[in-house]
């Protein structure tokens, strides 16, 4: 029994790793899933066991060859299970049409396929074949953590539901405070909690934070997820994945077509909630993976702080739930780091496991693959460079072998090229990005990068929203000149008579407490903005300090293994490149890259936060570091700005703000789209930006545009909110549909 566990009840149990019982239970689950009259709840339970439970149980046993810790094996087994589901769906989708079955992605073949996969895994898993007596033991401290975590999740679901019903975000704020309370408990009792309990607390905290955002709206809400869901629907409606039906990079990400189709078919969960709930819950494991990978090489405090920094970064709770393909890719990348840092297992067992996980990332998300390849390539170059320097200086080798090898990078690169090339022919965007980047480097072209670079210590020119709008108008006019001359687009003189202007992002009114601070001389809006800008600088500064301190300082908070130092250096160099090369900052996103980088360098940020308080006692420095990350968490998640006012609202806490106006789908929007769909067979969807409106097109204006008179366009990775010129449509078209929240012109 684990130290600190409480005695349980002696019961007759079959171990989950009992081969006959496991296979029998899985076969029964496959049968229940296949029967048309099985109740929905039974299908849900049976399907979850068939898709996730049984494979994860077997992968837990198999992964012991490359992962030494129990909780590490649990986490890696889940990642391998997700990859198994993707590969099984791909195999079924490829094999059945070849033998005359045009609809392979239906419940019966998928269920039978999963049963065969489980049977195959059972033959490889080192499991028993007998019944045994076992004790059910509850780890010490699990009760309070479970109660607090469950309360946070319930509050998060209730908070999102209240907001969707038009009520206030007060419950959502309380949910975040409950998450903060849970994190405080995890920190205060960190030495008494086992890794299992700490991981349980982290996954519950992360799930609550993510569900606050993912459950917003009764329909699919967010940016990338809108197209991701359409890719899923295309595969779902065809009962088959066919890249030729939509030959775009999104459709080459099997994490958003084959995986959700399999999950929906075998569990009965509607596809909409696979994206809004299942994927966020899987992604909630990523902070735990960060914790486990750091715990392999550092103290409990550093590992816990690392996971908290990963959760406190804004992209985690504002954007990740809107990028399902990246959620799955980050889950697999977290598993990669758990295996890399687990030095208790031999390299010959860990390297093949990492290679399999990296190939899973290739199938899940293209840009994550490219960034990982560059990071690993830089790490390998540093390793080779270090060996060369030692050889030139006639110094003996260090005796340690780097984890990353040339053949590992080569195989992943070949896999990526093969997948985006011959297999799917979706590598066009990469070629465009490379060509534009080369043009930037050679001075043959100039362009502005994403405004996200303004948060970087590496620099990045700031471009005003007004200038960005003018640039976009000029760009669209240039691109459409020939069509406009033929009369296909609205004439420029009409557009010139109704100029557009940028609308500044509105801030929440000051609360009572915020007004009190204002009366005593505190500029609350300025304070909120300063804290946000300072937070970005603090995180980057901590990263730099942590990397230097872990490498050169005499008094080190933790001794980073060479592999982690090299990978962190690679990720840091990559961030610098993304910042200074405009096209890369637009196509791959600096903030997303930093979130990905935290999987590698979170321990350096955490260690630097402790090291920066080294002038105090050891115990106090850790507490102050925890206070810093908690302050960042409460401010960046929106708790502090909501309590003060004077800052733009965040989607997870309010029915206002930029994300709400742009991405929140209202019933009026759907009604207008449905009305239009019933009256036209046109499928060519264009932009409503005035310079792109065609003379013969329908123009559907959304709820936010009709109610606020504002619309948003995207250019060079930035959103530009502008005053919509209704006069253009009034002068050139007729209004044929009008409701309380949407309008259509023709």
Task: Please state what every model-predicted region is.
Residues 21-30, 197-207, 354, 540-546, ...:
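Transmembrane alpha-helix segments characteristic
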Residues 48, 169-175, 326, 370-371, ...:
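Hydrophobic/aromatic-rich transmembrane helices and adjacent perimembrane loops
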Residues 185-331, 596:
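Active-site lumenal/periplasmic loops and adjacent helix-entry segments of GT-C-fold
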Residues 188-191, 347-348, 388-404, 521, ...:
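Membrane-interface helix-loop-helix junctions at transmembrane boundaries of multi-pass membrane enzymes
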Residues 333-350:
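Membrane-interface transmembrane helices that cradle and orient dolichyl/undecaprenyl
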Residues 339, 352-369:
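Membrane-interface alpha helices of multi-pass inner-membrane proteins
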Residues 431-505, 509, 516, 523-525, ...:
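Extracytoplasmic
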